[in-house]
Each structure stands twice: as C-alpha cells, then as structure tokens.
Amino acid sequence: MLAEIDREVGARLDAAAQAHPNPWEGFRACCLSYLDLALEPEIQRIVLRDAPAVLGQRFRDLDEAASLGPMIESIRELMEGGYIRTGDIEVLARLVNGAVLEAALWVAAGEDPAQRLPRARSTVEILLDGLRLEARGAGRSDGVAPPRP
C-alpha cells in the first residue's frame, strides 16, 4: 500500500513541477506540493503517521531511496543553470529533502493540520528562497527534472 501511494505522490509532484516553465518555480512548487499532501487523509494517515511509527528507520530508508536521487539531480541542474547558490550537492539535497519531509510530518502530527500547513509552507519558502540566486537564471525554462521530497 505504501509503495502504491508513493508512486501516486511521485506522479503528482512531477505534475506540480512540470506545470511551471521555469525550473526554479517547478522545484519550489514540487516541494510545497509535498506539504499540501499532508492534509489529504489517506496520505496523512498512511505515509506521514502510520509508516513512520510502524517502520521506524526503515521509513527513512525508503524515503531516501525514493527521493534522494531525484533531489540530487534537481539540485545539480539548478546549480548548473545558475538558479541557486553552489555548494555540496548531496548535502544540500539531503537538507532540503529532510526539511520538507520533517515539515510534512509536523503538519500531519498536529491536532489541526490545516492550521499548521500555512506555517510550514511559509517557513519552507524562506528556506528555499535562501538558496535562490535572484539575478542569475531568471526567466530560463530549460527543463530541470523535478525533485521528490
């Protein structure tokens, strides 16, 4: 069941990213869309509550296996395209992936997830915007692969 939901989530995140011609905006939309999924009952219960509780570290391992590769590729392409600051690609991918996942887990764990979502979104936006190089890469649309947080 978890694998099936993960595939569906991946497809939805890909669609969110592809809806934007600018790779940076697609990346940002993908990360924020993952947070939005924390309000959907099935995803909230199975992916963000039950799976971490039942699987423990195995949940983290599965998340890394599914999302780290695409996140690394997206970070690499955004750096090469001049959209974000340069740095250690793997470390940055792990940090962004972890931040988005932790924010989604926090949203789902609350008594009122809908109240938590705007707080999580605005904070993740601050984090992502801190990576952005405003003057470089503006207006580009060269098709960076979307990440999967």
For the regions a protein language model found, what residue spans apply to each?
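Hydrophobic alpha-helical connector segments
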Residues: 4, 14-40, 92-96, 142-145
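Amphipathic alpha-helical packing segments from all-alpha helical-bundle domains
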Residues: 4-11, 55-81, 90-94, 118, ...
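Short, solvent-exposed positions on alpha-helices
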Residues: 21, 25, 87-91, 114, ...
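Short, solvent-exposed loop/turn segments at secondary-structure boundaries
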Residues: 21, 58-61, 111-112
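C-terminal peripheral helix-coil segments that are non-catalytic and often amphipathic
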Residues: 33-37, 68-81, 97-99, 105-149
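Amphipathic alpha-helical segments used for helix-helix packing
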Residues: 38-57, 109
